[in-house]
Design a protein with these regions (language model features):
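Glycine/proline-enriched, intrinsically flexible loops and inter-domain linkers
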Residues: 1-144
Length: 144
């Protein structure tokens, strides 16, 4: 289970915004096929991803990257599916981040000789170049 809640004040409109985003993940491979890539689990219900252009306009942030996870993981005779990588850049100070990611310390395990999947995490990249990696945080203050 991976969930991200990101919010703040829109720099152009002054209105508060909140993004509640279950993360797309991959499913394990099986006997005859690779695993599915970038899918929501049944626990997410009728949830859809928001197009980048709408996300940027509504929420006053930049989506720097939205792609399949480029990290290695899940390789085997039938490869496990890939999750996503989403990079956001906030445009105004005073934002917050809450997240909870499972499989951060112990990645999804490989079966029948397949390799383990990649771990789940959030990276905070500061303007000074420092990087912090987290799997759980609540109301973490974000600076521009």
């Amino acid at each position: 289970m991976c969930a991200t809640v990101l919010g703040g004040i829109h720099p152009d409109t002054g209105r508060p915004y909140t993004i509640v985003e279950p993360q797309l993940g991959g499913w394990g491979g099986h006997a005859i096929n690779d695993g599915s890539t970038a899918v929501f689990s049944g626990f997410h219900g009728m949830t859809f991803n928001c197009p980048v252009e709408i996300n940027e306009a509504r929420n006053g942030l930049f989506v720097e990257r939205l792609e399949l996870n480029p990290d290695p993981g899940g390789e085997g005779r039938q490869r496990g599916g890939k999750g996503i990588r989403a990079d956001y850049r906030i445009r105004a100070a005073g934002g917050f981040l809450t997240c909870f990611y499972t499989r951060s310390k112990f990645p999804p395990w490989g079966l029948a000789g397949g390799l383990d999947g990649s771990p789940n995490y959030v990276e905070i990249r500061r303007a000074d170049g420092t990087v912090e990696r987290h799997a759980e945080m609540t109301n973490f203050g974000l600076k521009q």
